[in-house]
Amino acid sequence: MISENTIEERLQALRAAIALHDFHYYVQDAPVIPDAEYDALFRTLQQLEQQYPHLVTPDSPTQRVGAPPLKVFAQLTHQTPMLSLANAFSEEEVTAFDRRIREALNIDRVDYAVEPKFDGLAISLIYANGILTKGATRGDGYTGEDITLNLRTIPSIPLRLQVPFPTGQFEVRGEVVMLKTDFERLNEQQRKNGEKTFVNPRNAAAGSLRQLDSRITAMRRLTFFAYGIGAYHEDQPIFSTHSEILAYLATQQFLVARQSSTVMGANGLLAYYREMNAVRLSLPYEIDGVVYKVNDLAQQEKLGYVSRAPRFAIAHKFPAQEVSTELLAIEIQVGRTGALTPVARLAPVFVGGVTVTNATLHNEDEVQRKQIMIGDTVIVRRAGDVIPEVVAVIVERRPTHAQAFVMPDHCPVCGSKAVRLPDEAVTRCTGGLYCPAQRKQAILHFASRRAIDIDGLGEKLVDQLIDRELVHTPADLYRLDIDTLAGLERMAGKSARNLVTAIEDSKKTTLPRFIYALGIRHVGEATAKALASHTGDLDRLMDMNAEQLQQIPDIGPIVAQSIADFFSEAHNREVIEQLLSCGLQWEKPSHIAQPSSRTNLAVPGKTFVLTGTLPTMTRDQAKNRIEQQGGKVTGSVSSATSYVVAGSDPGSKYARAIELGIPVLDEDQLLSLLRDTSSSE
């Protein structure tokens, strides 16, 4: 069972990540992750906070709208918050939204206003007695940036309202976008000028609107679409529905999306969604979904708001754009941790504003699940409009020459054996000490403080050593000299001497540190200590097979196989020999826990958990007796546990054993079980 501390740490990590991405998206207008990935983070946070409401904090992203604005522009406080909308990604979520509305209003059918969801920047316009006086970005929803001068340059924003205009203050809200044709024209001009082009219309609109020099904004073609109103005086026009607001804004010469409409009930919402998704590409501007709002303003008022969004509205997001193309080949990329990832090489295709030639296939299971073959016509989606992904095969178009994909059993980079451990989806290169693709990670880990501990060997220095081909494996570190190091960037003679001294000092280490430094997958510090304690000798450890390794306490089949695979790879053994020949050494431990070599063990391979206080034995004594008879003792109860040995005052482990139906022994029963074999010797 996951502890509450673990949940709290997960919540803190999610909040920190979302806050950082909010800053990139809302403030810098330079998102670093796809929208779909952000949505997944936010939904995960929402779900966890719903499960653990007592862990919700006031500063959680779910309790606010966005991120604080920059201090570059003057700040403008919104009289009424510019809230974001909750998102729906499926028809089921839309149906659930409609059901909540009907139940809250106690009516059978709801009249909805529906409109496109522009992919631009939300803007507030303030008119005083019919004259545009202020304009601001949404910012964090409560305070935005005053960009009045820039907004005044946009032709589709009226500087003066039509007579009769509302008296006092009147706020219009909408979205600034760049039309597709204007975006293409701007990028063409950028290319001619030798300047950086924009990735998509939204980025172009953001970059244009947030210029400190409004003359630059004036040269960019931006368009404003109105979709609502904010604060206004009581003596201003009285509206009863949202559609009436849009109609009024149109009379004031604001652009209002022609696709705005009204529908009845969930069926009407879904029909509108399908209609807009079908015409999405033909629209003059980018949209990433549609917006549903309860049309009746009195009903909106009754439904109210949550801290982040109105209850009466929701955004129904479109799936990422999808197109078909030919899969020309499947190549393997090797990551810095040794993961082998199949990558589709595609006939070039334009998806979501960019030309795509590669797409991730994730892993071998995904290729098989989707029945992907080389030569297939595949559907490519830009997941989150950023990461290209092969989502399906058009089997009807499969050519006769299509070839099945076979995951390689050797690393394409270094030739080492590639293995896939049980219960893992990823195939990995076992040449961790040798593989060029893993070189940087292997050297940094080897030299880290808890491993061999080479003081002064940081990431930037390792980059230089690798880039200049001075170091290929950790063993090469011990061949570096002062003159070579002094020739590197930011490495004077003194720094070089200090590093050579640190490298020399690192030769005297311990066996647990050395084992940990090798970077064997699943082998942390505790496991390295256990391996050293129970073998006492590196050669012995390197020659053990997976079955023998499992006789060591807390070494399960997956970890055992990972260790065996690592040491069976000749490249790794060669690097280890080089390290030893360079002078790395350690003292042998004074006590070595030897697994019994007897063949007639009482409990070979059985797993025990101890809980409570035993009458005549300490836990260590009980553990030693169990291990002498081929068993192993672990610290937690699971379905893999063979027996739980309970003394007086047993803890939660006892209750867990009862829950799982695992046999519970007292001390006498344990001794009897262990004597069954010893008495027959």
Curated annotation (Swiss-Prot):
One of its GO terms (cellular component) is cytosol. Its cofactor is Mg(2+); Mn(2+). SMART domains: BRCT, HhH1, LIGANc. Pfam families: BRCT, DNA_ligase_aden, DNA_ligase_OB, DNA_ligase_ZBD, HHH_2, HHH_5, Nlig-Ia. The active site is at 117 (n6-amp-lysine intermediate). InterPro entries: BRCT_dom, BRCT_dom_sf, DisA/LigA_HHH, DNA_ligase, DNA_ligase_AS, DNA_ligase_CS, DNAligase_adenylation, DNAligase_N. It catalyses: NAD(+) + (deoxyribonucleotide)n-3'-hydroxyl + 5'-phospho-(deoxyribonucleotide)m = (deoxyribonucleotide)n+m + AMP + beta-nicotinamide D-nucleotide. Keywords: DNA damage, DNA repair, DNA replication, Ligase, Magnesium, Manganese, Metal-binding, NAD, Zinc. DNA ligase that catalyzes the formation of phosphodiester linkages between 5'-phosphoryl and 3'-hydroxyl groups in double-stranded DNA using NAD as a coenzyme and as the energy source for the reaction. It is essential for DNA replication and repair of damaged DNA. Belongs to the NAD-dependent DNA ligase family. LigA subfamily. This is DNA ligase.
